[in-house]
């Protein structure tokens, strides 16, 4: 056990803070979404930035162009996760960025397959063991989840998708005809109102006295009615104001 810990301590490198950052987004590498990936030109980029480069579609298929030197790196399985990781940076991150593993602290244990294979032995009779199974969610499973229907919509038994556009077209035509007819009627009333005075004079000249008087008096009578209505409204407001004040 001691020799195994000394081996892990000797393999952990000393890295400065600049080497633990992605040179595109300047975020620190981690063991989840921002794993340090090594390109064919030995430049290191986090996995999240590589996914963005692939999604942009500027590079050919199955190829990633290095944003620093334009070197083309082929992806073995047409997936960013198939690119090799920088084991030195991963080891430094797993050790807490202190340049050595946590073997100095007996209360902490680095769970790696290599370490577990040395710990779990027939001679190890202690019952205080904790087994943790960690599985990484595959990237290919997300489109499948997105394609599955989450909500089932109610569809009646008499549902006919062909008749819906026809009914909608008839309804639109009916509403359009109603609106047009109302506008035409309003315009005709306005035209009749403003032409009532010359029309009334013409009827009076033509000796049609009754219709002539009606058309001639239409505009003045409407103006008088509006004036009386406005005057009554003002008087009512003044009366209500006087009643409301103590």
UniProtKB/Swiss-Prot annotation:
Q: Name one GO molecular function term.
A: ubiquitin-protein transferase activity
* Transmembrane intervals: 184-204, 211-231
Compartments it resides in: Membrane; Cytoplasm
Q: Enumerate the Gene Ontology biological process terms.
A: protein ubiquitination
Q: What does this protein do?
A: E3 ubiquitin-protein ligase that mediates the ubiquitination of atp6v0c and targets it to degradation via the ubiquitin-proteasome pathway.
Its quaternary organisation is:
Interacts with ATP6V0C.
Write down what this protein is called: E3 ubiquitin-protein ligase RNF182
Native organism is: Xenopus laevis
Organism classification, top ranks? Eukaryota, Metazoa, Chordata, Craniata, Vertebrata
């Amino acid at each position: 056990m001691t020799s195994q810990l000394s081996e892990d301590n000797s393999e952990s490198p000393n890295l400065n803070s600049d080497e633990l950052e992605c040179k595109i987004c300047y975020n620190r590498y981690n063991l989840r979404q921002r794993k340090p990936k090594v390109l064919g030109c030995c430049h290191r980029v986090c996995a999240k930035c590589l996914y963005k480069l692939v999604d942009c579609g500027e590079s050919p298929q199955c190829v990633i162009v290095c944003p620093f030197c334009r070197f083309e790196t082929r992806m073995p399985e047409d997936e960013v996760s198939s690119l090799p990781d920088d084991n030195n940076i991963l080891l430094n991150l797993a050790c807490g960025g202190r340049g050595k593993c946590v073997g100095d602290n007996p209360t902490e244990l680095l769970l790696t397959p290599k370490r577990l294979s040395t710990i779990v032995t027939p001679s190890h009779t202690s019952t205080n063991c904790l087994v943790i199974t960690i599985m990484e969610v595959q990237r290919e499973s997300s489109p499948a989840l997105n394609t599955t229907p989450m909500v089932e919509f109610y569809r009646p038994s008499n549902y006919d998708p062909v008749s819906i556009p026809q009914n909608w077209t008839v309804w639109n035509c009916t509403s359009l005809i109603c609106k047009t007819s109302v506008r035409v009627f309003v315009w005709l009333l306005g035209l009749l109102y403003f032409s009532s005075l010359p029309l009334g004079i013409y009827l009076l000249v033509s000796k049609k006295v009754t219709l002539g008087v009606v058309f001639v008096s239409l505009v003045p009578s409407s103006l008088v009615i509006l004036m009386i209505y406005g005057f009554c409204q003002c008087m009512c407001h003044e009366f209500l104001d006087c009643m409301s004040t103590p």
